[in-house]
Amino acid sequence: MPDKFKRVHVVVMDSVGIGEAPDAAKFGDFDVDTFGHIAKHVGGLKMPEMGKLGLSNIREIDGIKKAEKPLAYYTKMQEASNGKDTMTGHWEIMGLYIDTPFRVFPDGFPDDLINQIEEKTGRKVIGNKPASGTEIMAELGEEHVKTGALIVYTSADSVLQIAAHEDVVPLEELYEICEFCRKITLDDPYMLGRIIARPFVGEPGAFVRTPNRHDYALKPFKPTVMDALKDGGKDVIAIGKISDIFDGEGVTESIRTKSNMDGMDQFIAVLDKDFNGMSFLNLVDFDALFGHRRDPQGYADALVDFDGRLVEVMEKLTDDDLLIITADHGNDPTYSGTDHTREFVPLLVYSPRFKNGGSELELRKTFADLGATVADNFEVKMPEYGTSFLKDLK
């Protein structure tokens, strides 16, 4: 393909897996299938835009017709890295291979870590267990407001979260506490992927989170394709939690979002900008609101809503644009527990330039093939891992 694309748009539907990976059992996952099981649960998904692109051509999804002439190139990608969390998935998409998984704490954090937090802050720690943020806020929020104790909790991910009422622990103090936690959990025995500040406001029984969440991630251990793009003078516009996932590395502009639909609004606004490089959008609600909470109906509704916004996206794309839709792991809301699931992820690659539509690409054996393709397009340093499929897009 002679001309390169001026803009590449990578959209990550957080946790929207498309069927059990070959090594799923190693991760404790059996018969998991995020997309497939959601579709079955609701008696078929209505996602005509994704259908036209070729979603059911990857493998049939109840309710979504297989496209006779798919508009996009399509396949699925298999994760190579040793993990099934957000950071591992995104870092691999941008060209890294993660051998040592981030640590998880399904029984809460060790006393040693909790003691360090209490000594440093002069505040007691309450909670210290895996929990949904909204539930633990409802359960312990009143005690926190009365005592000033910090609500510390985790999830199925490698994460330490601290929830605090903005009138009890001022934002600046909460951020300082999280920065301290970040410093002491960079290496073994903790090796945590993220520390998250989770401020909230309101009265007992009606606490609500504020948009002042802040993530303190580990920096990627090697440069990613994003760094290569930035170093090559290209734009890297991070939308949603992308900047947090990469701790700002390789990002030239960061746009925060409040929800999937706000994320789509921001993305559509970015499409109106004149830039040369990559936009990178994460839609986290699929995972945070519906996957972990095991809510297949809510998840289905969110997928349908996303599909509805693709009409606006497609209208704004020109022959200079390449749109890549994928995911970072699975999170089957019909499965037991609350953890992510080890799955293949969909890959749909579209440009109005493809006048004859798309066709099937080879199965990708690492998410890094996506990053390699972006690097290849912009003629910047190729990642150590990944094989570009740019030449297959005709």
Curated annotation (Swiss-Prot):
Pathway: Carbohydrate degradation; 2-deoxy-D-ribose 1-phosphate degradation; D-glyceraldehyde 3-phosphate and acetaldehyde from 2-deoxy-alpha-D-ribose 1-phosphate: step 1/2. Its cofactor is Mn(2+). It holds the Pfam family Metalloenzyme. Binds 2 manganese ions. InterPro entries: Alkaline_phosphatase_core_sf, DeoB, Metalloenzyme, Phosphopentomutase_DeoB_cap_sf. Keywords: Cytoplasm, Isomerase, Manganese, Metal-binding. It is found in: Cytoplasm. It is an enzyme of class 5 (isomerase). Isomerase that catalyzes the conversion of deoxy-ribose 1-phosphate (dRib-1-P) and ribose 1-phosphate (Rib-1-P) to deoxy-ribose 5-phosphate (dRib-5-P) and ribose 5-phosphate (Rib-5-P), respectively. This is Phosphopentomutase.
